[in-house]
């Protein structure tokens, strides 16, 4: 009996040592970005932005090329971790590229773009998407960078993923601005480190800039993380608008705007998005979503072959636009969630010349 207890004790001690070593390695390798980091804006474009010219902007969470209509995901109540093999990742990326090319946008804001993650077969997805705007200027910022995510079973593994902005006009300057992380150690070490990717595009004939903010705010938190990140976003937008710049924030807010009447009720037991109070942005900004088509679907089960009636949909992708930007239209483009668990959202707008 004593011998058996000793063996069990040694096994438990060995497990504790292995876990401690693993936590030590992951802690030492934890991604710790500075509050503000300069991002290299690659591939200088030749086009310029002008006031009073119609422009088109698209935002799309592309689900790291692995969350097509076949996918379910464990964090949403499904069982999937690795949801696409290499062939399916390439199929999804090809569909995403085709859609973006057809939309012919001047600026594209993408979220969940993997550049070397196990979950998307170590694919650098920028290689497929970079020239969807010919001659585009582009910028990338990490939103998720972990040596190894050790959960669930099988574990997610290595992740390198982030926000990716493309512009027909030159991005003169870009920055990664860290957002508050709601998680403490040890969850923090293998979790997302969310940010704002701020790109500055000069407006010809003026000393103003179009300040583009690409974002993907907190999803699986108690709600405090989303709120803190939204407050920081609000401060940034007001500061830039106060300088006389044109300001647009677009992306996956993981929240519904309070001024949007969503026709998609949240069913019992499903993930619940937060709410952004539109009144908090009053006096300078408009919050825009198009509820005609859902921007996101639940990943509790695959969408292919499912009955849309009773399926969980959400409105969580959209734009916040300063008052000196005239909104000419907004549309959620219905792609049937074929290649991502989100639909792209298109904004047509004009930078107003007279902003006095």
Label for each model-derived stretch:
Residues 79-86, 113-115, 180-188, 216-224:
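Surface-exposed cleft-lining segments at the edges of enzyme active sites
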Residues 64-65, 114-117, 144-147, 171-172, ...:
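Solvent-exposed loop/turn segments at secondary-structure junctions
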Residues 68-73, 122-123, 150-154, 176-178, ...:
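Short aromatic-enriched loop/helix-cap "lid" or pocket-rim segments at secondary-structure transitions
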Residues 137-145, 174-180, 329-333:
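Conserved S-adenosyl-L-methionine
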Residues 56-62, 92-122, 166, 199-201, ...:
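Active-site beta-strand/loop signature of hydrolases that rely on acidic residues for catalysis
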Residues 5-11, 18-45, 200, 235-248, ...:
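Metal-dependent phosphoester-hydrolase catalytic domains
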Residues 47-57, 69, 159, 163-173, ...:
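Beta-strand-turn-beta hairpins that frame and shape the catalytic cleft
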Residues 2-131, 135, 140-160, 353-355:
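N-terminal, active-site-proximal structural segment of metallo-dependent hydrolase catalytic domains
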């Amino acid at each position: 009996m004593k011998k058996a207890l000793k063996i069990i004790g040694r096994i438990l001690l060995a497990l504790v040592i292995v876990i401690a070593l693993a936590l030590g390695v992951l802690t030492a390798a934890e991604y710790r970005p500075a509050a503000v980091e300069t991002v290299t804006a690659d591939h200088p474009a030749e086009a310029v932005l002008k006031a009073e010219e119609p422009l088109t902007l698209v935002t799309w969470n592309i689900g790291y090329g692995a969350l097509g209509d076949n996918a379910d995901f464990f964090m949403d109540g499904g069982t999937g971790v690795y949801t696409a093999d290499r062939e399916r990742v390439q199929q999804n990326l090809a569909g995403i590229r085709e859609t973006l090319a057809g939309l012919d946008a001047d600026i594209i804001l993408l979220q969940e773009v993997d550049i070397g993650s196990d979950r998307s077969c170590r694919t650098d997805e920028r290689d497929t998407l970079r020239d969807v705007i010919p001659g585009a200027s582009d910028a990338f910022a990490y939103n998720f960078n972990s040596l190894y995510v050790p959960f669930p079973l099988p574990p997610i593994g290595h992740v390198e993923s982030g926000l990716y902005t493309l512009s027909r006009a030159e991005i003169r300057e870009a920055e990664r601005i860290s957002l508050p992380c709601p998680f403490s150690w040890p969850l923090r070490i293998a979790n997302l480190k969310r940010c704002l990717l701020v790109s500055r595009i000069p407006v010809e004939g003026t000393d103003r800039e179009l300040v583009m903010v690409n974002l993907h705010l907190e999803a699986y938190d108690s709600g405090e993380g989303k709120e803190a990140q939204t407050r920081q976003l609000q401060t940034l937008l007001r500061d830039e608008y106060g300088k006389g710049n044109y300001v647009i924030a677009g992306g996956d807010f993981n929240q519904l705007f309070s001024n949007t009447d969503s026709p998609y009720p949240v069913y019992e037991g499903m993930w619940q998005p937060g709410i952004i109070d539109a009144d908090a942005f009053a006096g300078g900004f408009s919050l825009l979503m198009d509820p005609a088509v859902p921007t996101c679907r639940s990943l509790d089960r695959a969408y292919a072959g499912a009955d849309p009636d009773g399926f969980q949909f959400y409105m969580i992708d959209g734009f916040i636009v300063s008052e000196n930007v005239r909104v000419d239209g907004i549309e959620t483009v219905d792609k049937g969630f074929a290649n991502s668990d989100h639909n792209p959202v298109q904004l047509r707008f004009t930078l107003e010349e007279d902003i006095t």
